[in-house]
């Protein structure tokens, strides 16, 4: 019998399908190839050859082209393969669950013994699919099948695909098949970034550390995948009709397809053999009649030439590696066995340091001299509290006489661990790492720490932290990526390290974000690159990411002479060697490189409790009795004390301590500070004032005009309208319109417009506009929306020109195209040119058939400008008042700069409240005197000119420091961030940048801000 054979070689798996003459599946096979594509192909073809000697063959899949070229076999692009399968097979919608165990290579046998369900069910209703949604290991697609084929595919980012689910399962410490089981038990959905899988991971990790339930996290992960697919791929086209779900994640995780159904408000289905549609399409397209055993021999004989750029091997030979190991064994923390220490009754007191990190938890004990007595390094597996509890229980069991006289926590879980176990204090992790490095190398002048999700670089000057570099919201380029890739290879990190060390020609993957290197990795796989060379290339890339993307150095050798590298990632000899080769110098790696945060915390506990008498009568902070009585419980709350409506997890411990997470301010915790001081800090927050000042324009019973002659007209409260609302509201009200302003954004606003977003790369504030339009049309039933295009902003004479950025200026046109059934007024106007402005508006209002005349428009323009100038004057006056009052009360001031629309709570994620809650006054760029300054870039954008002006103002005020909010995806901020940094650094001021996007958890933001404050306070210096 002549059969049709299709191979689908994807990013993580290989699949094979054999069809009979009637296109029925008579054989199928599936397993992970672990990047060994040729070996996997030989394996799977051998199994086929056992049953079928010849057949028509074609190959598809993201990693299949190299093999197709080797065999001179037809390659079918996977989209067309999927389309051919959809067209060539009859699809029946049934309740049958087609389950496949991905961990087994032997597939279930049909009665005919051919390896498949020969008698496929055709019960149920036959359907014609309208849309196919396919999720693979690192690929995602939506095929719109009606009205001609339209395909949407993910780019190089693997966010929202099977590999992301793999990462999340690993992060939660569960098997991937448990995701579905846990998701079905969920009671709460956490808002998680949907733009990118790594961003979602950055949201999830702090939730894991803060004790969120795994069941809720599991479903939240699936929701994030749905959001990524709809927002990132559909890009404004509505998903409707008969939906077919394809690919591994949608096959193996029924809860994922259920989440799609929930969000799309429809009922899709997973067809039989959904996992094999690409392979089936390839089989249908097969044109080469082949002998299978000939193909196997051809693969064995073919060697792939190196077609990629290579780097120097990490180690030329065993001798070089031995010298490397010997050199790095010289710098050590002094150690002593804990049992030996406790055998001397004079040495009962120890100090505990806990580093509750993003993926691991580290604990150390030291004596009063800083000698390391005990250590533990382990994955936190989603429960840091239980990890610490188990460590302490085992400690007391092994050493009943031990007394813990002081304790300190650091890392993501700093506050959680400190409260759970009555520790004396917490310390921001950057400061903890500095303390530890200084203990080993007193003259240290630069520290590089690469952990699971965080990258910290500290510049040390005169014995104190002088500058801080942290990776942004994205955790790519850190240890977690290497860990994930090792998992994909089926090896642990020790084996991964060995593979990289034995590389002879590491592949050059550049210094891009490592998630975006997937395309390069796939290409290397197609070319037959060895796993060793890919592993070594990734080690180089992590190093380059630190040097050129985080530190942003142009000369690696200029960082310093006494460099300490630390963090779990540097436990890898391969990463360390790549760093030394790239730097062209030798560095110091402590023998406890992965424990430096915990060790620094223990040193700080020692300093914090320095007045304790070290004798046998000293009172420990934790006892064995305390641990026996230890318990905690958690509950989910929604805080309604401000517009953020934070989703709170409240954890109460047996020691009467409570821990709140998810809150962006201290309002929910009335006991945190006294009410008078809290009220003062609220008054010293310009962002609170901005929202209150603009609230007078919100649409409500008091602020409506139902008898307006010209009816309702809507304004979206976002982008170019945010600061201009006083003008437009007054202007249109004066023309006798009932002006409806959409409310302040929240998560629901984003979800309302999510399906209309045409690009996943546009900034988050622009994405929110779609939701504001839906609110105006669906909730307020506004018949007309006024959303003008403003090429120019108000001219404040502080720049060479006064443009708005292209998104701010012209997004109204995108909105109009996305909402063809709504009536939009989108005039191109210049608020600086009254004559042309009024004439243009007159022509625009003619579309509404009003009798508004030009003189009325001119009067309304004057009234609007008066209103706008009053608002801007009020902001400046309030800013001056905040600065004056903060100085009177000796409160530090933060200049939190960005764009006017960064005042939106859903955009800034509560960062102003967070800074205020840390005891600082908050002002913004609108609060400072306007002044044109010299810049190193073309200064032609109004919003950006204000940033430069604010930075210059900060350089002239010692008690004010700047923090810049940047929306991810903002192209112009690639320029402004460098210029703002340059202005500040000329005056020896620290620059702090906060990347904000759909991310909702502020754990990383809090660490960055506290690091700034620690450096400013001189909290950690050589004198400590």
Predicted regions and their residues:
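Glycine-rich phosphate-binding loops at beta-strand->alpha-helix junctions
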Residues: 62-63, 234-263, 274-278, 410-413, ...
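An N-terminal assembly and electron-transfer interface module characteristic of large anaerobic redox
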Residues: 3, 154, 159-164, 475-482, ...
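Conserved phosphate-binding catalytic cores of ATP/NTP-utilizing and phosphoryl-transfer enzymes
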Residues: 64-99, 104-150, 230, 234-235, ...
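Short glycine-rich, Thr/Ser-proximal phosphate-binding strand/loop in the N-terminal lobe
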Residues: 4-39, 43, 150-151, 155, ...
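Adenine-nucleotide phosphate-binding core of ATP-dependent small-molecule kinases
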Residues: 200-231, 519-548
């Amino acid at each position: 019998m002549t059969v049709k054979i299709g191979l689908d070689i994807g990013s993580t798996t290989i699949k094979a399908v054999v069809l009979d003459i009637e296109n029925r599946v008579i054989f199928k096979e599936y397993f992970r190839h672990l990047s060994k594509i040729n070996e996997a192909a030989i394996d799977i073809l051998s199994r086929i050859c056992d049953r079928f000697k010849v057949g028509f063959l074609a190959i598809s899949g993201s990693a299949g082209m190299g093999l197709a070229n080797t065999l001179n076999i037809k390659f079918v692009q996977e989209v067309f393969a999927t389309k051919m399968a959809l067209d060539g097979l009859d699809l029946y919608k049934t309740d049958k669950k087609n389950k496949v165990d991905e961990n087994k290579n032997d597939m279930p046998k049909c009665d005919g013994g051919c390896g498949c369900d020969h008698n496929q069910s055709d019960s149920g209703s036959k359907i014609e699919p309208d849309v196919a949604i396919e999720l693979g290991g690192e690929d995602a697609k939506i095929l719109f099948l009606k009205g001609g084929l339209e395909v949407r595919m993910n780019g190089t980012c693997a966010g929202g695909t099977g590999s992301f689910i793999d990462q999340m399962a690993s992060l939660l410490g569960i098997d991937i098949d448990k995701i579905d089981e846990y998701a079905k038990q969920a009671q709460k959905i956490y808002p998680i970034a949907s733009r990118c899988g790594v961003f979602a991971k950055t949201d999830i990790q702090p939730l894991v550390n803060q004790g969120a339930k795994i069941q809720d996290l599991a479903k939240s992960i699936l929701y994030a995948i749905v959001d990524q697919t709809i927002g990132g791929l559909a890009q404004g086209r509505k998903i409707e009709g008969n939906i077919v779900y394809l690919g591994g994640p949608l096959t193996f995780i029924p809860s994922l397809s259920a989440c799609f159904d929930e969000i799309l408000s429809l009922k899709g289905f997973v067809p039989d053999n959904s996992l094999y549609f690409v392979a089936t399409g390839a089989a249908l397209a097969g044109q080469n009649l082949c002998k299978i055993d000939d193909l196997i021999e051809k693969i064995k004989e073919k060697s792939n030439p190196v077609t990629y750029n290579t780097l120097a091997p990490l180690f030329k030979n065993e001798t070089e590696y031995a010298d490397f190991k010997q050199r790095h064994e010289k710098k050590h923390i002094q150690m002593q066995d804990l049992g030996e220490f406790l055998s001397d009754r004079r040495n009962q007191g120890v100090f505990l340091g806990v580093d509750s990190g993003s993926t691991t938890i580290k604990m150390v004990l030291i004596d009063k001299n800083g000698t390391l007595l005990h250590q533990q390094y382990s994955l936190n597996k989603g429960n840091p509290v239980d990890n610490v509890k188990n460590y302490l229980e085992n400690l007391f069991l092994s050493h009943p006489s031990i007394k813990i006289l002081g304790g300190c926590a650091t890392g993501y879980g700093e506050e959680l661990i400190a409260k759970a176990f009555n520790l004396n204090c917490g310390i921001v992790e950057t400061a903890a790492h500095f303390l530890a490095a200084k203990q080993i190398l007193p003259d240290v002048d630069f520290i590089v720490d690469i952990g699971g999700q965080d990258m910290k670089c500290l510049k040390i000057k005169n014995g104190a932290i002088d500058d801080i570099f942290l990776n942004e919201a994205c955790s790519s380029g850190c240890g977690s990526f290497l860990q994930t890739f090792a998992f994909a290879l089926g090896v642990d990190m020790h084996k991964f390290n060995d593979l990289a060390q034995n590389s002879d020609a590491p592949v050059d993957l550049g210094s891009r974000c490592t998630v975006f290197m997937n395309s390069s990795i796939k290409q290397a796989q197609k070319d037959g690159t060895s796993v060793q060379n890919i592993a070594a290339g990734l080690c180089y890339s992590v190093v380059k990411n630190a040097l050129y993307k985080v530190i942003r150095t142009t000369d690696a050798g200029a960082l310093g002479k006494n460099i300490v590298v630390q963090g779990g990632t540097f436990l890898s000899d391969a990463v360390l060697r790549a760093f030394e080769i790239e730097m062209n110098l030798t560095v110091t790696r402590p023998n406890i490189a992965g424990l430096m945060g915990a060790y620094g915390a223990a040193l700080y506990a020692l300093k914090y409790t320095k007045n304790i008498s070290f004798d046998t009568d000293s009172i420990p902070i934790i006892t064995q009795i305390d641990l026996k009585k230890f318990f905690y419980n958690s509950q989910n709350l929604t805080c309604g004390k401000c517009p953020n409506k934070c989703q709170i997890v409240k954890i109460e411990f047996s020691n009467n301590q409570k821990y709140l997470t998810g809150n962006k301010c201290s309002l929910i915790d009335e006991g945190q500070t006294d009410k008078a001081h809290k009220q003062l800090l609220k008054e010293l927050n310009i962002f609170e004032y901005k929202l209150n000042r603009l609230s007078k324009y919100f649409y409500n019973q008091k602020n409506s005009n139902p008898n307006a002659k010209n009816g309702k007209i809507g304004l979206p409260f976002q982008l170019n309208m945010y600061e201009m609302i006083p003008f437009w509201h007054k202007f249109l009200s004066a023309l006798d319109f009932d002006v409806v302003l959409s409310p302040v954004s929240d998560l629901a606003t984003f979800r309302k417009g999510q399906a209309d977003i045409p690009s996943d790369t546009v900034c988050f504030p622009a994405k929110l506009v779609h939701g504001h339009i839906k609110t105006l049309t669906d909730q307020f039933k506004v018949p007309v929306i006024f959303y003008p295009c403003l090429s120019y902003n108000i001219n404040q004479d502080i720049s060479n020109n006064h443009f708005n950025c292209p998104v701010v200026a012209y997004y109204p046109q995108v909105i109009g195209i996305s909402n063809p059934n709504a009536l939009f007024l989108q005039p191109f106007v210049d608020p600086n040119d009254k004559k042309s402005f009024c004439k243009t508006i007159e022509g625009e209002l003619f579309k509404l058939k009003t009798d508004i005349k030009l003189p009325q428009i001119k009067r309304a323009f004057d009234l609007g400008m008066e209103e706008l100038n009053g608002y801007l004057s009020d902001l400046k006056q309030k800013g001056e008042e905040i600065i004056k009052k903060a100085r009177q009360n000796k409160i530090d001031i933060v200049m939190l700069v960005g764009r006017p629309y960064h005042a939106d709570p859903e955009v800034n994620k509560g960062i102003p409240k967070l800074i205020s809650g840390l005891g600082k006054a908050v002002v913004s760029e609108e609060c400072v005197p306007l002044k044109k300054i010299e810049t190193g870039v073309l200064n032609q954008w109004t919003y950006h000119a204000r940033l430069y002006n604010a930075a210059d103002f900060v350089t002239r005020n010692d008690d004010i420091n700047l923090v810049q909010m940047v929306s991810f995806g903002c192209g112009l901020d690639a320029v402004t961030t460098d210029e703002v940094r340059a202005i500040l650094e000329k005056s020896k001021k620290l620059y702090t940048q906060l990347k904000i996007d759909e991310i909702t958890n502020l754990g990383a933001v809090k660490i960055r801000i506290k690091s700034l404050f620690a450096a400013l306070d001189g909290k950690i210096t050589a004198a400590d």
